[in-house]
């Protein structure tokens, strides 16, 4: 195991000698360096006495800092073996932001999940009638139902990327797909580039592997290849997770020139790109044509992840991975230790729904456009201090609060009947407190009422305690 000297930790932590309380500033400095990769995971920290001498503080101060790091999950210790850096286990935290309460009567603005389209009921009824034709085997296919893999491959081909069914692995949603890919390709201490802000479950999946998260900032204007390149070079990352199509939460859309530059960057640094296309089909306005990231890939560096949840319905729990045929098979072997295969009925339904793709896209576009207008108009009328860029697709607004803090606001809003997803959920360790993600996937009248309640929460604080959770629902 690598060691860090007391002098190295003192330099990297960069604590102002006048900071008060000093132990907390020291713990924050060490944590920040772990999160940006300057202090690697699984390296031995100096003994408390040595670090205290280097910093010219009492040993009690360093002991308190180490205790705080252990409490937060950034330090592990064993009697006689010393202490070493770590990453927190998301499952051990008191508040798990990936699961938020549902069934409590609140307006659920923490979740960007559209309702089921009209075509879903028809598709389900049809596949129930058709199921006996597919029920002669044992029902287990780790790669996914051949019919559905053909439909997904055909859609990629129609979008400009020739794809064979053997390149497709059907999964239990995009989150399952992310876990499979990261579980196979990322290990403890490996650097993984992510956007900041980004999809929270991607951070969760990488952390569960013990990977070192390297955030790279993006804005409503999009991605800067020079920043991505610099972060990849400095961190040594060989895997980057990106969402170029109506990015969650900003709604940004990456243009083709940037896609080409990013894939060229991956080629230069011998890195893989894990591309999340969950929102790809949901352009709300007319947008310039963009090609899939895989269209710029000349040497199999792009692994694409898709989902039925946003276009059709989250309850279907069907997603997929597009990769090389060899990698798709490796992922299928990897998934077999967890769930063997996906349910046939839902896969048949999604295969049917692909036949209604354009119909559903048009239905979604109309609904999202109306809901987006209601949310935007409500915010401009009732909360004009908040600013945002209206996205041309996807399902979320990334709102800058301009002086308000998202976490206290979310706590107050729950007392007014609105559940929110504050900015820190989409960043690392308390960053992005000045932002809020607001989805426009609910009906217009619900969003109008939600904004009125948000104004009351901002002006008056909690109207009462947040409802006691009745059940759990996913934050997506």
Predicted regions: what is each one?
Residues 298, 304-366:
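Conserved core segment of the aminotransferase class I/II
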Residues 368-376, 386-400:
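Conserved glycine-rich beta-strand-loop-beta hairpin in the small C-terminal domain of fold type I
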Residues 402-405, 443-445:
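Helix N-cap motif at beta-to-alpha junctions
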Residues 194, 215, 275, 350, ...:
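Hydrophobic residues in well-ordered beta-strands that form the structural core
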Residues 322, 398-400, 439-441:
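Short hydrophobic/aromatic beta-strand micro-patches
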Residues 1-129, 150, 332, 336-342, ...:
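N-terminal basic, amphipathic alpha-helical segments
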Residues 135-269, 281-299, 452, 460-476:
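Conserved core of the PLP fold type I
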């Amino acid at each position: 195991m690598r060691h860090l000297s007391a002098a190295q930790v003192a330099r990297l932590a960069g604590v102002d000698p006048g900071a008060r309380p000093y132990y907390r500033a020291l713990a924050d400095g060490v944590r920040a360096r772990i999160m940006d990769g300057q202090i690697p995971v699984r390296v031995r920290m100096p003994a408390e006495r040595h670090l205290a001498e280097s910093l010219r503080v009492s040993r009690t101060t360093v002991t308190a800092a180490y205790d705080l790091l252990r409490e937060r999950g950034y330090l592990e210790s064993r009697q006689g073996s010393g202490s070493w850096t770590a990453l927190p286990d998301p499952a051990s935290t008191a508040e798990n932001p990936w699961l938020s309460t549902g069934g409590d009567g609140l307006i659920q603005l923490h979740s960007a999940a559209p309702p089921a389209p009209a075509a879903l009921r028809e598709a389900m009824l049809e596949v129930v009638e058709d199921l006996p034709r597919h029920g002669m085997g044992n029902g287990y296919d780790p790669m996914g139902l051949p019919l559905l893999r053909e439909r997904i491959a055909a859609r990629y081909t129609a979008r400009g990327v020739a794809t064979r069914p053997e390149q497709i692995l059907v999964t239990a949603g995009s989150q399952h797909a992310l876990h499979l890919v990261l579980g196979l390709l990322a290990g403890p201490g490996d650097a993984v580039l992510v956007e900041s802000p980004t999809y929270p479950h991607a951070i969760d999946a990488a952390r569960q592997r013990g990977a070192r998260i390297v955030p790279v900032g993006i804005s409503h204007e999009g991605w800067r290849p020079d920043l991505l390149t610099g972060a990849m070079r400095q961190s040594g990352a060989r895997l980057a997770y990106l969402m170029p199509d109506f990015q969650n939460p900003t709604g940004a859309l990456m243009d083709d020139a940037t896609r080409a530059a990013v894939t060229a960057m991956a080629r230069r640094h011998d890195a893989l790109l894990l591309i999340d296309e969950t929102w790809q089909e949901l352009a709300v306005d007319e947008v310039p044509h963009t090609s899939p990231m895989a269209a710029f890939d000349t040497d199999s560096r792009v692994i694409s992840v898709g989902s039925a949840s946003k276009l059709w319905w989250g309850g279907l729990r069907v997603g997929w991975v597009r990769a090389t045929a060899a990698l798709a098979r490796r992922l299928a072997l990897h998934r077999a230790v967890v769930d063997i295969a996906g349910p046939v009925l839902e896969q048949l339904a999604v295969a049917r729904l692909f036949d209604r793709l354009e119909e559903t896209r048009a239905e979604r576009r109309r609904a999202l456009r109306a809901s987006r207008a209601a949310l935007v108009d409500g915010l401009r009328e009732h909360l004009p201090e908040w600013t945002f860029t209206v996205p041309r697709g996807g399902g979320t607004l990334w709102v800058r609060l301009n002086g308000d803090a998202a976490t206290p606001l979310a706590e107050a809003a729950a007392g007014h009947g609105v559940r929110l997803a504050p900015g820190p959920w989409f960043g690392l360790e308390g960053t992005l407190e000045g932002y809020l993600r607001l989805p426009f996937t609910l009906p217009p009248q619900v969003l109008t009422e939600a904004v009125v309640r948000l104004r009351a929460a901002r002006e008056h604080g909690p109207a009462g305690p947040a409802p006691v959770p009745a059940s759990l629902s996913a934050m997506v």
